[in-house]
Structure formats: structure tokens, C-alpha cells
């Protein structure tokens, strides 16, 4: 605690120094910590740039003149809690920048003074001086602000040497104080005086003189061994020339009558704010409480904090009434294990009441209490259970601020609540309140704290809290962010540590006024429902408290621990309307593409061909190789256009067929089966022929059925070789005349894989020889016999005609 106090005071000094002379940017504080290292002398290897040196809690017993020569920039030196017995301030003559020097809690018996003009803080308290260690040089330290002293004797002459200094704080820390000359303290010129008394010290004289000395007076370690009552019963409790307006008594252990007299004494002084902290009292009450004089006072505030009772022989009701009858504005009785409180049966002037951390119950509000000026009521840390009962009490006051946290409060739906329209701030945290609490809130509330309760949802029947600006509903059981339809002015919302998986869209849309949101540490489910919430931090003016480390995914498991800002949810997968539009556009584009292909590439024709090929492929798979060979009946199938039939009839057929029937030709007209479709007949003819001859001309490429025949022949699945197609170019075909679907034909023509009909009749012999050689197949004798017999039967059935030249074109 001592070190903390030193650091606090040092920070104050540094801030003051910076206000007088701002440091340059390159000048930085460098702290060297050598505390609690059992050092017996100051280290010789200190860094020259050191500005703060802590040598506290060591074994130093003497300081040498050369100890601090190397640290010329030293500003703060802490030497408390060592064993130093003598001090020569000339040791610091080279430390011109020294501002803070702490030598408290040593064994100092003497000090040799040297003018340290820049010193602002000097603490010599809790040492072994016989008298106050003050001389003329101390009076020349014009910048001194905080001074700590100690000594076994206090005399007026000690303080005369520094009476002209205006000090901020004087701290007197005594190990023993057997002698005090009355009237010594008022000589000091200080704003605050803090006295730490040793045991068995008559504090009364110091209290009287202290009130005459400073505006703020603090006294620590007051016990009842000083015979205060017997001493003061012989003296007048009145006091003249009082200066103190703030009085703090800390660590007080007195009989009740002693405390009673202190209250009465202070009541008639200049003290406006009186605080007693860590007080223990007991014993019998000999003084009459009704004798307390409440007149002639400037008292405004009384605080009793951390009150403990020993064996007590007085009714506590009398104590409560003694305090509540005081005509003051502010009363605090906290941490006192107080089971109840009594008020007079007439109106009081209390504006602020603090009964925190007691054991008050609902019985407090079952009596009539007249508080027409009450604005702040603090009842946290008690045993209150019924919220509606509190509201009925508050309705008779102009209450503005109410703290009911850390109680046992509940509210039932059938209980009526009536609050004054003045309530603006209410703390209901750490209770047992459920959803029904929203039906028992003042309409005027502006700041509401409901954290650590049992709230699961904000009911739709909630009172419209149009003035609510801040709502803290953290550490509850909510599964969704509350909408702002009932809180139209809400600007700050804290909803961390609930069970929110996916905040609803209603919050994003209805809470446009929210500027600060704390929704961290919730088990977020990172799906599309969370997309709008994630975008709040980026695309809105909402400040997300704790973003982004406190906002992580809990579900799905593969994203657990992932920060929300690192989760990427695609707009297409989360926006149903956009997804539908995208699908429609894609389908439309595909439809247009298919339509274009159908028009430009004759796609329907290819689809029909694919279907026919598929049927043929399935049929071929079910047919054995022997059956396939047995089905072959012709050497060649001839495909041609009707416009080229004369050439086929007059030239091709006569030159290919022989009278011995060694070459069998299949023509479409001759073997057409009326029971099958045209495409099935074409497939059948191609399957029953070893070769397919195509008579090419401009007429051929314009014929639809010729294209079918070429397509099926090209994809003849039972031919293992690729030479089963024979092309005869009857007339030249310009490439631009060939439709796109004839891409295979184009490729063959480019390779010149065809027989060209010669215009010179003398070359025809060679043409027919090549053609016969191309279609001539070595057929087994048995096969030839079978084929000849079948062919003869077919010829007889067709009236003895060997070849029919009838052809149906472009059916």
C-alpha cells in the first residue's frame, strides 16, 4: 500500500511538472527497480539515464556522497523501508532534477539539511526522530508540495520554520508521540493534513487542532484507550476558528459513547463531509441519545463504512434514529450488517441514501417513510425480494437514481408496479428477475442495468420505454437480440454472454439509433442468418465493443473458434431473391445458348442421331459376333441423292454388279421394310452391308436422309476397321455449300479420302477397277452360298428383278 501511494503521488508530481515545463519528445522516463533485493549499498552500475530509482525494502543503512553522482537525471528516488540512520541531503547535490524523495520507514535520527530547490515531495515519516526534523533550509524549499514528517515530540517552534510554505499535503506518521504541544498543528499552512497515530495516543487534542489546520483532515488509528470521555466531559465541545470541511477517521475502535461525543463535537464545527471508515464500537450506552443537539450545523454528508459491532448493550433502533434524525442531505451506512433501518415519522431532507452491503429485507418498505427530497437510493448487496414493493415506496419520492443490484429481487406478472416519472437510472443487476421485469419498469427510465438475471426474452407486451438510452442485459439467457420497437431511443446496448445464435433481422432493422453494441462472447451460429449482423461493424456506424476477438463462432463445429470477421458468407448463398434471379438468368442464358445451337448447329438432328446410335449400340451389345457376321448380306450399301439417280442407274450399278452375283449391292428402294421407320430401315441396311458407298455431289449435302445415312455409316458400331465408308465425288462440292453438321464429311474431303468420277471417259476403267477392289471382300464359301440363296429368294419375291432403281427422296 505504501508503494502504491508513492507511485500515485509521483504521477501527480510528474503531471504537475509537465504542466510547467513539457518534456521534449526524445526525453523518456527510465525506471530502475532494485527493490526487495537485500542490498546493503547502492549499486555502482546504475544506468546514467535513469530517472526513477526504486531501492525500497532493502538493507541499506548508510548513504555515501558518491552513490548518486552517476544518475544526474534522477527525478524520483524511493528509499523507504531500509535501515538508514543518518541522512545528509548534500548527498543529492548533483541531482538537480530530483523532485521526489521518499525516506519513510527507516531508522533516521538526524538529518543534515541541504537546499534542494526543485524538490516537490519529501517523506521522512515513520522514523526515530526525537523532534521534528525541520530547519531553516526546509523553509527555503519553495516548490515543496508534499511533506512527510515524524518525531517523538511536536512543538510550535518546529513548524514555525515552514509556516510560510503553502503545502498541498502534510503527512505525519508517528511510531510514538508521548508529547504534543497544543496549538502546534494550526501553524501549518496546508490544504490536507493526514495524521497516523500510534497506539495509546490521546487523539482528542490532535483532532481539535487538526480541524483548525487544514481543509481536509484525515486521522488513522483512533482507539478508545485515551480516556476520551473522561477528558472531554470536563471541556466544552464547541470549537472556534475551524477550517476543516472534509473529515475522515480511519481504523476507529471506540466505545459507543466516545463515538457519540465525536459526532456531537463535529456537528458544531465547519465540517461538511464526515466519513468514518473501518469502525468498531461496542459497550454500554451511558449518554442519553435524546440529548443530541441537531441545531447549528453545516453538515451535509455522513458516511459510516465497514462498521463492526463488539458486545453491544444498546438497542440498534436508537442508533438508526439518531442518524436518520440528522438534518443532512447525504447519509451512508454500508457494510454494517444492518438488518433494518428506522426513520422519523416526519419528512426528512435526505437527498442521497446509501445502505449498501447490509442485510435489509422487504420490511424496510412496509413502514411509512417520508423522503420528499430523495433523489438517489443505493440498496445493493441486501436481501430485498419484491420489486413491486420497492416501486410503491419510490412512487412517493422524486427518486432519480436507484441501485438494487445484488439482491434477491423477483417480480410476478400479477403484481402492480407504480414508479415516479423522475426515475432515470436503475441498476437491477445480479437478482432473480425474469422476463416479467419488463412489465415493472418506470417509463421515464434512461439507463437500465439488468445483467446477471434470469431473462430469456423481451416480451412483446413490454412497456414502451421511449426514454431508454442505455440497456445492459448481459449474462442472461436471451437467444436473440431484442428489437427496438419498444426502445426507440436506445443508443447503447450490452448483451454479451447470453445464448444468442443468430441475431434476427428485426434488430438490425429496428435499432437504427444504436451506436454502441456489446454482443461478444455469445455462441454464434455462423450461417446466412448471421450475415446482416456481421455487416453491422463494417457498413454501419455502430461501435462493436470487443470486436473482433470477443465475437467467435460456436457452430458449426468446423468453424468453432473462428472470428466472425474471418467468416465469409457468399451473398449468392444467403440471398434467396438473388439466388432465384441468378438461376433464372442462368437458365435463360442456357436456353438461349441451346436455341442458338439448335438453329446454327442443327442440334435436334444430332440428338435424334444420338438416340438412334444408342439404340443400335444396345442392340449390338446383345448380338454375338457370329450373329453379326451372319446378318451381313451385302457387299455395299449405296447412298445417293435422287438428282443423281440417273448416274447410279446408268453408270454405277452396271459396272459394279456382275452376272455371277459376286458383288451384292443394297439399295434403299429394293429392301424397304414397311413395318419399320425410315431411320430403322437405314440402320438395318448399313448393318447388313460390309461397305457404304456415298455418291457425293451438291445435291447430296442438301439431302436430309443422305445426311442420316452418312451419319449412321460413320458411327457403324460393329465395324472394327475405319475403311467401311467409300466416298465417290461425282461433282465438285464448294466447302461453303456443305452444312455445318457435315463436319466429318468436310474432314474427309480435306484429306482427299475419296474416289473422283473422271470427266475423261478413257479413265473410267481405272476408276471402276479401284472401286471394285475397294468393295471386294473375301467371303467364305458357306457364307456366299447362304447369301446367294437368300439373294435369289429375295429376287424371286421381287418379280425376278435384280435391281430396283426406285428411290424416295426427302421423305
From Swiss-Prot:
Residues 598-811 are cytoplasmic. The chain crosses the membrane at residues 577-597. Highly expressed in spleen, lymph node, thymus, tonsil and at lower levels in lung. Highly expressed in promyelocytic HL-60 cells and in B-cell lines. SUPFAM superfamilies: L domain-like, Toll/Interleukin receptor TIR domain. This is Toll-like receptor 10. Residues 522-576 form the LRRCT domain. Residues 632-775 form the TIR domain. The gene is TLR10. It is found in: Membrane. Keywords: Glycoprotein, Immunity, Inflammatory response, Innate immunity, Leucine-rich repeat, Membrane, NAD, Receptor, Repeat, Signal, Transmembrane, Transmembrane helix. InterPro entries: Cys-rich_flank_reg_C, Leu-rich_rpt, Leu-rich_rpt_typical-subtyp, LRR_dom_sf, TIR_dom, Toll-like_receptor, Toll_tir_struct_dom_sf. The keyword Protein biosynthesis does not apply.
Amino acid at each position: 500500500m505504501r508503494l502504491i501511494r508513492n507511485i500515485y503521488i509521483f504521477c501527480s508530481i510528474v503531471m504537475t511538472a509537465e504542466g510547467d515545463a513539457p518534456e521534449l519528445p526524445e526525453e523518456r522516463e527510465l525506471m530502475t527497480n532494485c527493490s526487495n533485493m537485500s542490498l546493503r549499498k547502492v549499486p555502482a552500475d546504475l544506468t546514467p539515464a535513469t530517472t526513477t530509482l526504486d531501492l525500497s525494502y532493502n538493507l541499506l543503512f548508510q548513504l555515501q556522497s558518491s552513490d548518486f553522482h552517476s544518475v544526474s537525471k534522477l527525478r524520483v528516488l524511493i528509499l523507504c523501508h531500509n535501515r538508514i540512520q543518518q541522512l545528509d541531503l548534500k548527498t543529492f547535490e548533483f541531482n538537480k532534477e530530483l523532485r521526489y524523495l521518499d525516506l519513510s520507514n527507516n531508522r533516521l535520527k538526524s538529518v543534515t539539511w541541504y537546499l534542494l530547490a526543485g524538490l516537490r515531495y519529501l517523506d521522512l515519516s515513520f522514523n526515530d526522530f526525537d523532534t521534528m526534523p525541520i530547519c531553516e533550509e526546509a523553509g527555503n524549499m519553495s516548490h515543496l508540495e508534499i511533506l512527510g514528517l515524524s518525531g517523538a515530540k511536536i512543538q510550535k517552534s518546529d513548524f514555525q520554520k515552514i509556516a510560510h510554505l503553502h503545502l498541498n499535503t502534510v503527512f505525519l506518521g508517528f511510531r510514538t508521540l508521548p508529547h504534543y504541544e497544543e496549538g502546534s498543528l494550526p501553524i501549518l499552512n496546508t490544504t490536507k493534513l493526514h495524521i497516523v497515530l500510534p497506539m495509546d495516543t490521546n487523539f482528542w487534542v490532535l483532532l481539535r487542532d487538526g480541524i483548525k489546520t487544514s481543509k481536509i483532515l484525515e486521522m488513522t488509528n483512533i482507539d478508545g484507550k485515551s480516556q476520551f470521555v473522561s477528558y472531554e466531559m470536563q471541556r466544552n465541545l464547541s470549537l472556534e476558528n475551524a477550517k476543516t470541511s472534509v473529515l475522515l477517521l480511519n481504523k476507529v475502535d471506540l466505545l459507543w459513547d466516545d463515538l457519540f461525543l465525536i459526532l456531537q463535537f463535529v456537528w458544531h464545527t465547519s465540517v461538511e463531509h464526515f466519513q468514518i471508515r473501518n469502525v468498531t464500537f461496542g459497550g454500554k450506552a451511558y449518554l442519553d441519545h435524546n440529548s443530541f443537539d441537531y441545531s447549528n450545523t453545516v453538515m451535509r454528508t455522513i458516511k459510516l463504512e465497514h462498521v463492526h459491532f463488539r458486545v453491544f448493550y444498546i438497542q440498534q433502533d436508537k442508533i438508526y434514529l439518531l442518524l436518520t434524525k440528522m438534518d443532512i442531505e447525504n447519509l451512508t451506512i454500508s457494510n454494517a450488517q444492518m438488518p433494518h433501518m428506522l426513520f422519523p415519522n416526519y419528512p426528512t431532507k435526505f437527498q442521497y441514501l446509501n445502505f449498501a452491503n447490509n442485510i435489509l429485507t422487504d420490511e424496510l418498505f412496509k413502514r411509512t417513510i417520508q423522503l420528499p427530497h430523495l433523489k438517489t437510493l443505493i440498496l445493493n448487496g441486501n436481501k430485498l425480494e419484491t420489486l413491486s414493493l420497492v416501486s410503491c415506496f419510490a412512487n412517493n419520492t422524486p427518486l432519480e437514481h436507484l441501485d438494487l443490484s445484488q439482491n434477491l429481487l423477483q417480480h410476478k406478472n400479477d403484481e402492480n408496479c407504480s414508479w415516479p416519472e423522475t426515475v432515470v437510472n436503475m441498476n437491477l443487476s445480479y437478482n432473480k428477475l425474469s422476463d416479467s421485469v419488463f412489465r415493472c419498469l418506470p417509463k421515464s427510465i434512461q439507463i437500465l442495468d439488468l445483467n446477471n438475471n434470469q431473462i430469456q426474452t423481451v416480451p412483446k407486451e413490454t412497456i414502451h420505454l421511449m426514454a431508454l438510452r442505455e440497456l445492459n442485459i448481459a449474462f442472461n439467457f436471451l437467444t436473440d437480440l431484442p428489437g427496438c420497437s419498444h426502445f426507440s431511443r436506445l443508443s447503447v446496448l450490452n448483451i454479451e454472454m447470453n445464448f444468442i445464435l443468430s441475431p434476427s433481422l428485426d434488430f438490425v432493422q429496428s435499432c437504427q439509433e444504436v451506436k454502441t453494441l456489446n454482443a461478444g462472447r455469445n455462441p454464434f451460429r455462423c450461417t446466412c442468418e448471421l450475415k446482416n449482423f456481421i455487416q453491422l461493424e463494417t457498413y454501419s456506424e455502430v461501435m462493436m465493443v470487443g470486436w473482433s476477438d470477443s465475437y467467435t463462432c460456436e457452430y458449426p463445429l468446423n468453424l468453432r473458434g473462428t472470428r466472425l470477421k474471418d467468416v465469409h458468407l457468399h451473398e449468392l448463398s444467403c440471398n434467396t431473391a438473388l439466388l432465384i434471379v441468378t438461376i433464372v438468368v442462368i437458365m435463360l442464358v442456357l436456353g438461349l445458348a441451346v436455341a442458338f445451337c439448335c438453329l446454327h448447329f442443327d442440334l435436334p438432328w444430332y440428338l435424334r442421331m444420338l438416340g438412334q446410335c444408342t439404340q443400335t449400340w444396345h442392340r449390338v451389345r446383345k448380338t454375338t459376333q457370329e450373329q453379326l457376321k451372319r446378318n451381313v448380306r451385302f457387299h455395299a450399301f449405296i447412298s445417293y441423292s435422287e438428282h443423281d439417280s440417273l448416274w447410279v442407274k446408268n453408270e454405277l450399278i452396271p459396272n459394279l454388279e456382275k452376272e455371277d452375283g459376286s458383288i451384292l449391292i443394297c439399295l434403299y428402294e429394293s429392301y424397304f421394310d414397311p413395318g419399320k421407320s425410315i431411320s430403322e430401315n437405314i440402320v438395318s441396311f448399313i448393318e447388313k452391308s460390309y461397305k457404304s458407298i456415298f455418291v457425293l455431289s451438291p445435291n447430296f449435302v442438301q439431302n436430309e436422309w443422305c445426311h442420316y445415312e452418312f451419319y449412321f455409316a460413320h458411327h457403324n458400331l460393329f465395324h472394327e476397321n475405319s475403311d467401311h465408308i467409300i466416298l465417290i465425288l461425282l461433282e465438285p462440292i464448294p466447302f461453303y455449300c456443305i452444312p455445318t453438321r457435315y463436319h466429318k464429311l468436310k474432314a474427309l474431303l480435306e484429306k482427299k479420302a475419296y474416289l473422283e468420277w473422271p470427266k475423261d471417259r478413257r479413265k473410267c476403267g481405272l476408276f471402276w477397277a479401284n472401286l471394285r477392289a475397294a468393295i471386294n471382300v473375301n467371303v467364305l464359301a458357306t457364307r456366299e452360298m447362304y447369301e446367294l440363296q437368300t439373294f435369289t429368294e429375295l429376287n424371286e419375291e421381287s418379280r425376278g428383278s435384280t435391281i430396283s432403281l426406285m428411290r424416295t427422296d426427302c421423305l
